[in-house]
């Protein structure tokens, strides 16, 4: 997969460091969690799709770490940085053994097809 990202040479030298550091703390928080936990759900308050993913994991008996990045009116810039980092357009972002598997629909599909267990066992 080759996802287009603006080449650094097309950024003015005066803003390169700013762009590189933009909300890096949020990205590092997620990276730390996915290295420490088998399943990580990255979400936001009051999002029904985040709730669906977490409920599906709970019903399947899958323990998971949950990271909350604000709600509809807060921390949207940090969430946007996570979207740009992963390329995934919505929340939740569900990681299994460090791999982004998608959101609520993808979690539900993997559970229904009994594929999530295989990802966790490998």
Regions found by a protein language model. Name each.
Residues 39, 62, 87, 112-115:
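Short amphipathic alpha-helices and their capping/turn residues within compact interaction modules
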Residues 73-80:
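Structural motif
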Residues 96-122:
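Non-catalytic, surface beta->alpha helical segment in thiol-disulfide oxidoreductase systems
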Residues 25-67:
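Local sequence-structure signature of Cys/Sec-based thiol-disulfide redox active-site neighborhoods
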Residues 1-34:
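N-terminal leader/targeting and pre-domain segments
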Residues 67-73:
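Short beta->alpha junction loops
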Residues 86-96:
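Structural micro-motif
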Residues 42, 51-54, 58, 83, ...:
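Amphipathic alpha-helical interaction motifs in eukaryotic regulatory proteins
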